[in-house]
Amino acid sequence: MIKTYLVIPFLKYLIRKEAFLILFSLVRATIKERRNDGSDSIFHSKPDGKKTILALDSLRYRGDLDALSQNFRVLHLTQRAPGWLIKGFYHEFDIVNYINAPDGSDKKAQYIAASNFMTKFLRVFYSKVSVDCVTTVNFRYTEDHHWVKSSEKNSIPHIMLYREGMVVYYRTEYEVFRRAKRFGKFLGSHIIVHNVKCKNIFLDAKFASKSKISVAGALRMDSLVSKVNNYHKYKKIKRNKKVTLFYFHPNTPMFGVDAKGVTPKALLSHGPKKDLSYAFNAWSGRFDLFYDVHEAIAKLAYKYRDIDFIIKPKDIMVASPQWKYYDKAIEKSGINVSNLENYFIEPYANVHDLIFSSDVVCAMNSSVVIESALIGKPVILPVFKEYRDSKNFEDFHWKDDLDLFDVADDKHDFERLILQRLDDDDIPKEVEKGRKELFYTYFDQPKEGAIDKYTSIINDVVESYKNID
């Protein structure tokens, strides 16, 4: 195994010598093709009439690459290789500090050197790899910045498939606005967003012109909407009743973050219209709420062996140091869940399949709340009264829509609501209507399907770029 301390100096040497062919070979080895069956291959097919997308930072797309692979040849790579190429130019890794550095400064010189290097490298890269456009999911990552900027210089358009569409409460809206202002102008040809709220934030920040931003919904929601329209087929399946808790950790931003007396950057620039200082004082009851939620689930699983209880974390959560709080919660519950045949932790389960197969869904600041609501599932929000009475509740996604869900006041009420909703899953018509409106506020799915609209936009951008050349 090659040691990191040997690899880094070698890479720096290759970059300094502009050994582009060797660097190309190293980067090419990290690029995979997403097949239309969802598999990845290090062997790339020929375009065969399909336009080719090169997706940067591929781990952040979730199901989007699978959807795009139906209509495009999709090549993708993680941030690792672009990071190799760029990190040696910088002493710190907040790209905004270099973008906005004054002319003549060391930081500006480093920024220009990195940009010039990447432009020359990509000239070689694109001469050997057929690519029609580059996509990203955000504009804030240093690893992506020079790649997309230099791609445009090499006549390869950059299209951002912006994924942070859950701009539900004021602080998230403000943070997206503030970040866009700090970055200045969008480095690319087009932005596709999930909803009108995102588009308006970018317009207000003068990040991009109206003609450069399209609202097209979310690719991964096409299958959900299709399944909802055929939901009668799923209801016929007989099985044990199932309760699913979509996992959250106690240090999630909805509970606030301790700033330790330092005035947060968010309060210093492009002044917010509201006082956001509450968000930088973490709610003291967050651990108790977290432990109570898991104690309630564990005790119900112990008592009701004919009901399945699922904990659904993201896979990265299980690997995170934050997972120790889950272990502590189970220890505090006094229940040995490893001995329960009806208690499961499912980090790799398909989210939509899990929602459809569940009788009751429990979640917090997650899009699964409105996804489950659209399907017609009872959704329980364990936003206990003490949290609702705190200032940090301002950052709870669904604080203005509690009437569309079941809201638990404490752990005992949480247990009661789960059992009640297992027996009675009725959703009143007016609540169904409100839930549907809420879902389409954040996922503005076109009637023809998001994939058709994305395909049309991407094709138009690529063709218009060719016409300019």
Which role fits each region the language model picked out?
Residues 2-90:
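N-terminal subdomain of nucleotide-sugar transferases
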Residues 12, 275-280, 411-469:
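C-terminal amphipathic helix plus adjacent low-complexity
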Residues 298-314:
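A conserved nucleotide-sugar
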Residues 121, 282-285, 289-291, 316-370, ...:
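Donor nucleotide-activated moiety binding/catalytic core segment of transferases
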Residues 23-38, 185-288, 435:
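A nucleotide-sugar donor-handling region in carbohydrate enzymes
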Residues 38-42, 54-66, 79-227, 369:
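Active-site and donor-binding regions of nucleotide-sugar-utilizing enzymes
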Residues 327-336, 340, 367-443:
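Catalytic binding pocket for nucleotide-activated donors in carbohydrate/polymer assembly enzymes
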